[in-house]
Amino acid sequence: MKAFKFSLLCVLLLALTPVPAGLHAQGRGEGRALTPRDLLYVAVPGRVNDIGYGGIGIVVFDANKNFRFVKRIPTWDYPASIAPEDVKGIAVSVPLNMIYISTIRRLAAWDLTTEKKVWEQTYDGNCCDRMALTPDGKTLWVPSFGGPHWYVVDAATGKLIKDLQTPATGGAHNTIVSLDGTKAFLAGLGSKIMSIADTRTNTVSQTVGTFSGNVRPFTINGAGTLIYANVNDLLGFQIGDVKTGKVIQTVQVEGYGWSRARLTGHGCPSHGIALSPDEKEIWLTDGANSTVHVFDNTVMPPKQVKSIKMRDEPFWLTWSANGKWVYSSTGDIIDATAKTVVAQLKDETGREVQSEKAVEVLFNPDGHILNTVDQFGIGQVRAAAN
């Protein structure tokens, strides 16, 4: 009898134990606490068009299982005699349940449940580069491939909403939409001036610059008031003030040199920059030295505090949704606190996977998307510091 009462007490205590929000299994009365599935989607070829770093398709890894290979989603087939198109960008819409891939010739969307292509567009044939989604997941801002214009696109259908000319920013290349969804930051490979568009009117509202060199990868703070930009011929970064439109800081990496002869990709020493979610750190690539440098962003100018060796030349960085990891284009997974490499991406054949086009997606136990991250490593502090 005592054993029965003890067992009954245990059952009652378990029933009263709270389950973390969002982790409760749905349907059939199940009450098990389940961890959301945390998957990293990596589009290849994402180091130019070299299929030696992961082949062709979208390679998926499980972050909860030390980034073990899960599957490969087919994208395009190419005859052996034709070089594949290098992937230029990747993004995920939570409400539409779609993943988007851009190449040097097209933009396409796949349903993440069926893994089937939903639509594909080439627009005027001058498509495409690294795009961005508005926070509501409904509109894509897509750079043309090197032209002085961006496409504003309906994310559900691929329909062109507007072809926006950017006379101050040529060589359309990289795009970020602010966390509040009001601004699209437009950087061109052939320009020292960045344009900013008002997403409510789809018109250019201001410019920032002149930067010291043509603007390469960049990121912004969560308030959308500061731009952290790589530029040509600088092992480091510059900071642009959105309010004044001026460049306010130039930060160079100390203790490391570079030369063009030591660069095999992109032609600039730093091609990749990301803010930590709390905006206390800036992480910067150094392709010439196969290194990632970390800066303290709580002081101005930011101070270099740590350097981490990569297995190859890094050309892109972004953060995990939980702030635990930094993803390098080399396929190195970096523990953001310990600042050490804790895993390396390999595909189903054991081949190294390297790509500048990766995005993390978290799924509820029922398979619906819970959250995703932007490929640009945007700061997540929404209010500007006093």
Where are these regions (language model features)?
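Positively charged n-region of N-terminal signal peptides that target proteins for export
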Residues: 1-6
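Predominantly soluble domains enriched in secretory-pathway, periplasmic, or organellar proteins
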Residues: 14, 26-386
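Signal peptide processing junction and immediate N-terminal pro/mature segment
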Residues: 19-26
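Bacterial N-terminal signal peptides
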Residues: 7-18
